[in-house]
Amino acid sequence: TLVLALAATCGTLAQTPDPAVMARIRDEGMNHSQVMKTLSYLSDVIGPRLTGSPSLKRANEWTRDTLTSWGLKNARLEAWGPFGRGWQLDRFSCQVSAPQDIPLIAYPKAWSPSLRGPVTADVVLIDVKDAAELQKFKGQLKGKIVMSGGEQPLAAHFTPQGTRFTDEQLLAMAEAQAQAPGRGGGGGGAGGGQGRRAGAGGQGGQGAQGQRGGAGGQGQRPGQFRGPNLSGAILRLAMDEGAIAVIDGSRGDDGTIFVQSAAVPPPAVNPSMAAPAREAGAASGTAPASGAQPPRRGPSVWDKSAPKTLPQVTVSSEQYNRMARMIGFGEKLKISLDLKTEFFDRDPMAYNTVAEIPGTDLHDQIVMVGGHMDSWHSGTGATDNGAGVAVAMEAVRILQALNLQPRRTIRVALWSGEEEGLFGSRNYVAQHFGSYASNPPSAAFGGGGGAATRGPLTKGADYDKISAYFNLDNGTGKIRGIYCQGNTAVESIFADWLKPFADLGAGTITIRNTGSTDHVSFDAIGIPGFQFIQDVIEYNTRTHHSNQDVFDRVQGDDLKQAAVIEAAFLYNTAMRDEMLPRKPAQGD
């Protein structure tokens, strides 16, 4: 009788949060946190972590060793790929040298090739409305630096660039209806999916919603080129005509520049037959962000067999506009440019860092948490997504430090290749849990709601052993709730789990999807995969894929709160009698 009573008591505790354990998690995370120390080393010491680069490999090894030093088991690097070529910036300078000296706020795009040495060259501005107008520049570009696109007016800022969700916005997220299966929410930019049922109120400010850009050829602001894909056509012409480099203006302002990867020149086409432009920010050679993706459309710049391209540089919008206006007045500009980069072809594979807290009676079952460790290169990857990595590491550190004994194994995974197309998590999911034959892990995915991904599904050995995956990848903002990804069965469970943290501002339960980050890789094959709702702060306006993605833009108290809540969700998931319920399979 005593054994039965104890078993019943343990079962009850496994279904509802244990207040004493929640209090211990909170105390450890708020009063003994290491999250900012972890993030500072990752972003300040290791720095930017482009997929395939030596810096990312160093981050893989440092996180593996750090997790081991905290007492986690089976810490390792798991390879995926082949990815392609690594790249790093060794030396760069850029300034207008005539008719006057103007030091430029600028950054080369990733995977840009080197120049043969420092050069000073005349500047040619190409500001046209359609591809047919490019013909007049033939014979004028050899040995020149090309400015791609004209002046873009900038608006003053009359609203705060840093915001938190208001009570009204959280309520709207809570009351929204579920989306049709397979339809992605707005991208992971700042909470662009909305939801149903809310709890704790927010703090003042206006939260923006945003869609994350894709991986390639970015720099110009959306809408800079209308009609045919003039940016690609300009690059093609510059390449064919023997130009030295191509520069464009950033979509940012106030000296903030948003920089991603260089573009591969498109195949030469008749200007009158030019294809329509892809959505701004879409990756060169990768599928657009939508529900069911077609295969990639040709080589990406990081592919070992990618066609040659020109050095490509993004300049701050204010300075780019000034140069365009000077040329409009008839000034003859020269730019002095020096660019030395390095490619790494020896190891085409990329790596995820993985470590575990072993479970007890249900040790064969898994609860996962993670964030992507790769970043773009102009900042140090602090908010995208060093913050999510540091929070995931801190969450498992908290549980390990408290010597809690989870029933299920808790596994932390720190991904690579997210910025290029969720490649690290998608390959991991395919290797361990399953995949759709018609949607291989090399194809990029964007929106949420992945259960509509094409079948049939081939299940891996651990498909039925994983309870859930939790992700954080919307910058530095604290957790305000969680996206349920259309899984109505988890709403009440998550609502109970958030109650102990209502005073910390977390309480919104949203049925809607959000996409464009690594939880989608799990959700796409029917595994419960969740992204937390985060306050926007400056993510869309200032730090996301920019040179301002640095440690100083991070809010330490927000990350402490996020790590506490993430640790609590991991513990509660690990202690339940049953795994978290899954959404019905398509066709059920």
Listing of model-derived features with the role each one plays in the protein:
Residues 99-103, 116, 121, 139, ...:
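Metal-dependent peptidase/peptidase-like ectodomains
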Residues 17-53, 374-375, 471-477, 540-546:
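N-terminal capping segment at the start of a domain
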Residues 1-11:
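Bacterial N-terminal signal peptides
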Residues 37, 45, 397-423, 439, ...:
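Short helix-loop-beta-strand segments that form the rim/entrance of peptidase-like active sites
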